[in-house]
Structures are given as structure tokens and as C-alpha cells.
């Protein structure tokens, strides 16, 4: 369960990185520099550093591809987990459970797993959490 949560957190992190906005262009940085009349050397160095971030698009491409790979592996893990849960919960054979899972969409599989783990966590909650 811990590994599943960590994997989901990593997937969310890569999704945020892949969908992030591109860095400002050098032209926009020059406008900012003119508007603010930068006299402070540290600000000028900071703006130079931002101008050197033109490789950001390449990095986003890398993370986008990595995101797709991680998402594919997470989907495979969810399929296997759903089959295991169905075998254990419903007492059916692995082949029957696999057939049921194959008939489900990815969204239905995610909802099935969330429902299962939600009930499991609800049962484990402390008694003093009732309101």
C-alpha cells in the first residue's frame, strides 16, 4: 500500500512538471530588466541565469516521455492489483477475475481500487474520529 501511494505521488509530480509553463523568453527578460531598472548585481545575475534556461523545453520533453512510461506502468500495476483484490474478495478464480478486469475501463478500475482502499482505511480509522 505504501508503494502504491508513493507511486501515485511520483506520477502526480511528473504530471505537474510536464504541464508546467515554459520559462520566459530572453526578450521578456530584457523587458523586465528595463522596467525594473535593475541596479542590483544579484538581480542581474539572477536574470542571466533565467535566460540560460532555454533547455527547459528539452527537459519538459524528457519528463513528458517519462510521465507516459510511469503512467503505463501504474496502469499495469492497477490491473494486477484489481485482479488480486477480486480473487480475494469475491472468491473467484484468477482467470475469471482477469476477464472481469479486462472488461472494465481504466476509469472503472481506478474507481474500484479507490473504493476498496477507501473502505479499508475507513475500517482502520481510530474510534475517536467519529463526529
UniProtKB/Swiss-Prot annotation:
Q: Does the keyword Secreted apply?
A: yes
Proregion residues are 21-60
Q: What is its main location?
A: secreted
- Taxonomically, which superkingdom? Eukaryota
Quote the subcellular location field of this record. Secreted
Q: Which UniProt keywords apply?
A: Antibiotic, Antimicrobial, Cytolysis, Hemolysis, Secreted, Signal, Toxin
Classification via InterPro entries: Latarcin_precursor
GO BP term, pick one? defense response to bacterium
Instruction: Provide the GO MF annotations for this entry.
Output: toxin activity
Tissues in which the UniProt entry reports expression: Expressed by the venom gland.
Q: Name one GO cellular component term.
A: extracellular region
Residues that span the membrane, as ranges:
none
What does the record give as the function of this protein? Answer: Insecticidal, cytolytic and antimicrobial peptide. Forms voltage-dependent, ion-permeable channels in membranes. At high concentration causes cell membrane lysis.
Family classification: Belongs to the cationic peptide 06 (cytoinsectotoxin) family.
What is the name attached to this protein's record?
M-zodatoxin-Lt8o
- Species source reads Lachesana tarabaevi (Spider)
